[in-house]
């Protein structure tokens, strides 16, 4: 517990909040060759590796992920949501923030239905997250 004189001399320091998706908060200026702190909700990138990973205990599955080199030069690991995907190496994707709780080191999610990432086929409910168009009713 600080004394009154300690508080007068030094005061209280504000807590610094740490970003949960730090790669979205940086922009690379290629003309000046330096990084600026300009946050964005999405970032475009190119897949450098598409692979699978097993989750932490107690879950059991084979989760798909992609290693993505972003437009700001950073390389991140992003989760591929939904059943089945068409992503390969050199596919252009859009990523957003949002971690996968049971995959360590995965802080980003690929947006389905944009760029080279196709939407999930035959999806009726919750289509917005998976980039699926509304089915035609006959």
From Swiss-Prot:
SUPFAM superfamilies linked to this entry: Nucleic acid-binding proteins
Key word rRNA-binding present: yes
Stretches for region Disordered: 1-20, 116-138
Highest taxon, organism lineage: Bacteria
Single Gene Ontology MF annotation: tRNA binding
Keywords tagged on the record: Methylation, Ribonucleoprotein, Ribosomal protein, RNA-binding, rRNA-binding, tRNA-binding
Annotated CDD domains: Ribosomal_S12 (cd03368)
Modified residues (3-methylthioaspartic acid): 102
Entry's Gene Ontology cellular component terms: small ribosomal subunit
Gene Ontology biological process terms in this record: translation
Subunit structure: Part of the 30S ribosomal subunit. Contacts proteins S8 and S17. May interact with IF1 in the 30S initiation complex.
Function: With S4 and S5 plays an important role in translational accuracy.
PANTHER family: 30S RIBOSOMAL PROTEIN S12 FAMILY MEMBER
Name under which the protein is recorded: Small ribosomal subunit protein uS12
Designated gene of the protein: rpsL
